[in-house]
């Protein structure tokens, strides 16, 4: 059975919600799915004072586990147009896997969130995708089979490079049903692609 890892970092819960939607989509395709997060680097007192969501159910991933999956779908909120340092720090530890070619041929994808419509969604996706390409992975985005990314009647995320959500400047906007549908769609397509490639 196809094994999929949804790997994420979420400070305020928006990416956590998107990760769970991605996982739902991958499960719809018949995959076995694990949802894991990367370690928090912000000191506890600072995270609490900043109202980080610290009660996330997903277990902490270990870098050596990445080799166990047919597909890895990575999500993180943006930090000035690039992935959050927590995710970058985690992926930077994959040098041993890269050197052994342990991730070559696996399927990868990316999803993100920004505070505003023009807050760096696509550049953040590119920073994730660049890492995955260096690992030797085959990238699957959010293709236009998901027509919801072309909606003009509401504020919505979505890009051919990956599922996205817009949180609002104060973080009060949760992922919309359309954005969650995009995440589920991408998860399903990635799982289907991994099944075709890895059986």
Curated annotation (Swiss-Prot):
At which positions is NAD(+) bound?
A: 12
- Detail which positions bind substrate: 98
Q: What is this protein called?
A: NAD(P)H dehydrogenase (quinone)
Pfam families named in the record: FMN_red
Keyword annotations for this protein, in alphabetical order, are: Flavoprotein, FMN, NAD, NADP, Nucleotide-binding, Oxidoreductase
Q: Which NCBIfam families match?
A: flav_wrbA, PRK03767.1
Cofactor needs:
FMN
